[in-house]
Amino acid sequence: EPLRSPVARPTTRQQRKDRLAKAMTDVGLDPESANRFPHEFSGGQRQRIAIARALVTEPDVLLADEPVSALDVSVRAQVLNLLNDLVRERGLTMVFVSHDLGVVRHLCDTVVVMSSGRVIERGPLADVYGDPQHEVTQELLAAIPRIRVDGSTD
């Protein structure tokens, strides 16, 4: 579907097919499954399809809006690792939108914290996490579950 856009680069059916196969392979899916119905895929596979759809047009910037919030923990880790790999391998800039600052910590270099549609804090990850200036940022960071040495959580 994204390849049917007038701004998409491939012009022939074979070029579109090749681009789709590459995107599916890049996200860990078998290109032969391209004609399956959505209900035939797991939640993690559907998320990978969404990522492939975004990548198929070869963007410079990838907008990931809550890409793992509906996934279970093991699949979430796989998708986050995939996104991290894709950003590194393709030289992409990723705008990662999330309410989960625990996830943001592992994926982002720069953090922008918003509240009620306004930017309330921004900066390098180490600065925002190490010395949060805004009360909302402090509350969000305090809400990140932490594992204690004895294995229990806060």
Give names to the regions the model predicted.
Residues 56-60:
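A short, proline-enriched helix->beta-strand linker immediately N-terminal to the Walker B motif
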Residues 1-15, 123:
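ABC-type ATPase nucleotide-binding domains, specifically the catalytic core motifs of the NBD
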Residues 37-41, 45:
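Conserved ABC ATPase signature
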